[in-house]
């Protein structure tokens, strides 16, 4: 379905979207959208693409923002054109689309089931964050090597075996080990494979996979901070420190 939607995007160029935004931004904030326009948009999208947006909202540049499966698109009031891409406020240089996506992808940190995660504490451990990681993830190993330069934190690792069947076996071995944190670090930092898990060992791997899918975690590592923001990939210590600082505000 997304391919169909992207095909419709070809009917509108990025330049046209920016021009439309510049022209309408001079008019100030839009008036309350007539319900008829929203009904037209919803009906047209459902009829053409079989899409049911979770939200349809007016924008400052005259078009409508539609949310479909945490993705952001834009349509004109008659739903004749669909635009998929970044809209930039030329006055502030802010990427309005990315800001909206970041907001949509925020996680309720307080509701994360941290009892399903491997806990690693460094120093006093006052600063917290969460990762979703696969035992066979090369970027995860890079992340943990970089974390040697980070102090005073508690990391909760949701074992998220999505790369191979072997990932599942290793994840079981880590969770069922006597010292989960040490076993994880031995794998990430030294390349030591975890011991095989006992056949009767209970683990939260399926629950972790369901949680990750619900949160839209598509790759490892994915980092989540206490303010609900997330950061994909092997992030630098500097970037993590910046997120810690932002989470305090």
Question: Which residues are covered by each model-predicted region?
Answer:
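Short strand-coil-strand connectors
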Residues: 69, 226-227
């Amino acid at each position: 379905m997304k391919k169909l939607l992207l095909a419709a995007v070809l009917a509108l160029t990025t330049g046209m979207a920016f021009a439309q935004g510049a022209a309408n931004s001079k008019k100030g904030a839009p008036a309350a959208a007539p319900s008829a326009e929203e009904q037209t948009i919803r009906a047209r999208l459902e009829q053409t693409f079989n899409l049911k947006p979770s939200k349809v909202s007016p924008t400052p540049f005259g078009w409508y923002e539609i949310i479909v499966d945490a993705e952001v698109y834009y349509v004109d009031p008659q739903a004749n054109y669909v635009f998929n891409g970044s809209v930039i406020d030329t006055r502030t240089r802010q990427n309005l689309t990315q800001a909206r996506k970041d907001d949509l992808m925020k996680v309720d940190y307080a509701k994360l089931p941290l009892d399903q995660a491997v806990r690693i504490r460094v120093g006093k451990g006052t600063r917290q964050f969460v990762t979703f990681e696969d035992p066979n993830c090369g970027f995860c190993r890079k992340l943990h090597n970089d974390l040697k330069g980070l102090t005073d934190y508690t990391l909760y690792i949701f074992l998220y075996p999505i790369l191979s069947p072997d990932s599942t076996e290793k994840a079981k071995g880590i969770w069922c080990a006597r010292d989960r944190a040490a076993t994880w670090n031995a794998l990430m930092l030294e390349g030591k494979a975890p011991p095989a898990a006992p056949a009767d060992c209970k683990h939260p791997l399926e629950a972790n996979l369901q949680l990750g899918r619900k949160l839209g975690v598509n790759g490892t590592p994915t980092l989540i901070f206490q303010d609900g923001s997330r950061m994909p990939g092997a992030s630098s210590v500097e970037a993590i420190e910046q997120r810690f600082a932002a989470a305090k505000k």
